[in-house]
Amino acid sequence: MKKNVQIKGTKSGISIFLSDKASISELQQELSQLLADQKQNPYSGEKLEVQVQIGNRLFSEEEEREISTIIHNNSQMKISAFYSNVMSKDEAKKWKENDQIFSMATIIRSGQVVQVPGDFLLIGDVNPGGQIRSNGNVFVLGNIKGIIHAGFEGDENAVVAGKFLYPSQVRIAGKVYGFDSEDYKEVADTDLFSAFVNDAGEIVIDEIHKIRKIRPEISNFQGGR
């Protein structure tokens, strides 16, 4: 008969596996019994961090608290995290939004801030004082004179593509690159360029075709909004 609760050592440390076929009350009972049996071999060191693997199910906050309490009160272990093979509706919604390409055909004027959860394609210009914030990549088919912030929530793998003109600024995650020096002031036109964070953690401006080599997954993007 397969046990509903098992404690195993893994590459990432100690894990407690809770069967997704058992009810929460069955898991609580078996977990309490298993930990009680292990008290026969007491451990006197610091509390050990464990991961709790719950399989193809989700626990409510109350259920997580109940399991945590049992482990805390009956062992020298403390939970670092609960891990599930499935995601909540909110997580699924956010994942889908971040996987989409949002597109607009307009001019982003001074004072305007456009923010999207996924990748963003703009057909038009970004004027000085205008700003785009995207959790993913940003592609602008037009002149950039405002602020472009890709990887807004911290993704340093994001890229920006467009015509970078004075006094634009590119931000990728927490990195910043400015086109506000005198060298850029007299540039009236330019080709499309790409901006990305290199292995040294710095934003690099390079030819547009380099994107495919630096971020090959971008060539597989599909979709729209």
From Swiss-Prot:
InterPro entries: CAP/MinC_C (IPR016098), MinC (IPR013033), MinC_C_sf (IPR036145), MinC_N_1 (IPR055219), Septum_form_inhib_MinC_C (IPR005526)
Entry keyword Transmembrane helix: no
Keywords carried by this UniProt record: Cell cycle, Cell division, Septation
Keyword check for Secreted: no
Protein origin, superkingdom: Bacteria
GO biological process, one term: regulation of cell septum assembly
Family label: Belongs to the MinC family.
Subunit structure: Interacts with MinD and FtsZ.
Role: Cell division inhibitor that blocks the formation of polar Z ring septums. Rapidly oscillates between the poles of the cell to destabilize FtsZ filaments that have formed before they mature into polar Z rings. Prevents FtsZ polymerization.
NCBIfam families to which the protein is assigned, alphabetical: PRK00513.1-3 (NF001772)
Name the record gives this protein: Probable septum site-determining protein MinC
Organism of derivation: Listeria innocua serovar 6a (strain ATCC BAA-680 / CLIP 11262)
